[in-house]
């Protein structure tokens, strides 16, 4: 059963979408033949059906070993696509405050910034706990993870000794080349491989994302099942049957014809926050080139309705919204009756908190579309299980690649980020090769 439903009624007419039927078919068939620009990095689209099960079993065994050794915390060190997918998945499935009791590690994230305070506080947090490190970098030269790895490696070596520390350091990197691979060879760390044909922001279903998920207790096999089913749906060339590509075309029309500059992805569940962050990187780096692309923004409602709801309702007409409508929450709560009704909310008795959240969603969509005339794309998802997560990952990755190809862009490069890096390294005095 399909886990995602797309509703474009409050955004765009279906006839406008189908005008792109032939173009989408041509692009998709060229993708399948690896004839599109950037085809060297199309490996992600077949990942769900080409899992390296030997490596997967090794990851499972390493995660079980860490738990058996009473490791309390896994420090995931990476930035951008090297950590966002894992964090998105772990919080999507476990929630922001996961219930205790199952055999899993606490996951914390380092190397995501250059803040001395944040890094010092993380080091202090793990200092008196048993921790392991998963350093994730294809090249091993990205500055933020490199600095964090030095700090955490030194702390781990100080706690257990250099020889023993090697057992608790896991590297996820290139199979053959790069500085981190050289370090792995020298130190003998356990390592898992980032495929050559998968870029960072598309790497969530490689060991980049899968190993931290396993350590966090997720049923990763179910994520892969969902991704496989999703891929079977969304690799089709027929636009009438492929809602991932319908979403891509809707975004394209909003940007190029209706001249919107911003897409806001909205969830009414706070634990979707890092899924939204993953989405922002995916679309921001994929589309933001040649002075093109929608600016990807995200909001958690109803929280952000109390800060930005006014702007969306009556401010500049620069944005449209894509709303994730979760049908079944992890946990629901009933509103109980209070005989004194001192808080004045007895009218909510016999309603559930999720039902009230859905009412807020429906009311907001109506206010934004009927009154403010802000287009709303609705993505209805069945639940927040592992299988549904797998569906979502492939839905958005397929849609994102198609969005870029419709703009005649290479979806898999990001040359613009090299500018600030070059400036920073010049200021810091990095030696030239």
Curated annotation (Swiss-Prot):
Keyword Isomerase: yes
Gene Ontology MF, one: monosaccharide binding
Pathway: Carbohydrate biosynthesis; gluconeogenesis; Carbohydrate degradation; glycolysis; D-glyceraldehyde 3-phosphate and glycerone phosphate from D-glucose: step 2/4
CDD domains registered for this protein in UniProt: SIS_PGI_1, SIS_PGI_2
Localization annotation: Cytoplasm
Keywords: Cytoplasm, Gluconeogenesis, Glycolysis, Isomerase
GO biological process: one example: glycolytic process
Domain of life of the organism encoding this protein: Bacteria
E.C. numbers: 5.3.1.9
Active site per UniProt: 285 (proton donor), 306, 421
Gene Ontology CC terms, in alphabetical order: cytosol
Matches recorded under InterPro entries: G6P_Isomerase, Phosphoglucose_isomerase_CS, SIS_dom_sf, SIS_PGI_1, SIS_PGI_2
Matching Pfam families: PGI
Catalytic activity: alpha-D-glucose 6-phosphate = beta-D-fructose 6-phosphate
Function in brief: Catalyzes the reversible isomerization of glucose-6-phosphate to fructose-6-phosphate.
Cited NCBIfam families: PRK14097.1
Family, similarity comment: Belongs to the GPI family.
Protein name (database record): Glucose-6-phosphate isomerase
UniProt source species: Mycoplasma mobile (strain ATCC 43663 / 163K / NCTC 11711)
Phylogenetic placement of the source organism: Bacteria, Bacillati, Mycoplasmatota, Mycoplasmoidales, Metamycoplasmataceae
